[in-house]
Amino acid sequence: STMYVGGNFTGVKQGDKGTEISSRGLAAFDVATGDFTGQTFDFNAQVKALLALPDGRLLVGGDFTRVNGEAHSGTVVINPSTGQIDPSWDLQITNALRGGTVSVRALTYYDGNVYMGGAFTHLSGGGSSRVYARNAGRVSLSGRPDRSWNPEISGAVQAVGVSEANSAFYAGGHFTTAHGNQRAWYAAKFSTQPGAAVDTDFDFVPSSATAGKYQQTIATAGNRVYIGGSEHNLFGYDTATNQRVSGAMTFNNGGDLQATTVSAKGVIYGSCHCSDAAYQDMYVWSMNGSWSRVDEIKWVGAWDAATGESLKWTP
């Protein structure tokens, strides 16, 4: 098996004394040994998101416009067996806003479609051209955009997820409205049916009324969806009732949640720029005493995906 790492780098070196091999933006490693596989890539800008497709191909999203010398705006598909670009994926993404640049920052798969979020306005591919998809959209596994589904989110999307429990699409980011004037306050819930209707009963409440509010992680697990970001929060919501049912925050050298993933054993692992403590049952970005327990955290923490309770683990 192969593990891919994407980001903002220019090369790979095996060990401290190894020779650096040029591979810009994406690198591949053998899962069993940790060794570099030798596959090399040349992305002209940062890779932001990776998604393993059901058929084994790797979908890569990011800020790039060229990959290995070819034009690929925002996404490209890689064949993991060879490390070569899949030419059948012809999705091209544009941003028609004045001065706008394309960025695909989040990817997820659900029920035959790839859902994506970022900064863009239109999708073209698979025989369809200039499909309006404001900062979020979905495409088939062949890269054909779905013209019927456009949440029309007002600002850049940082995270996306679809819950198996309720078939709803969740997004987090730098936005406040959707579909023109409907409230979508930094995190929002949408139908996956045509029209992408906003669930107006879902009301995300940030941890601060005056400081940062943007959200940048979404993790779904059973009947819970977990939303993390600024300021310093990981909040859990019940997918059936839309009620917030758990909360954790990081202090004093705390930091915003930046990435989360759910393991096969039901553990949420979350990374943050935090090196002090995680406070359970805290919902407001203030040391006001409203918490039930405090645990050490060093850059990565673990929570029970069923309850949102801290597992008291950190590297």
Spell out what each predicted region is.
Residues S1-P315:
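Extracytoplasmic surface signature
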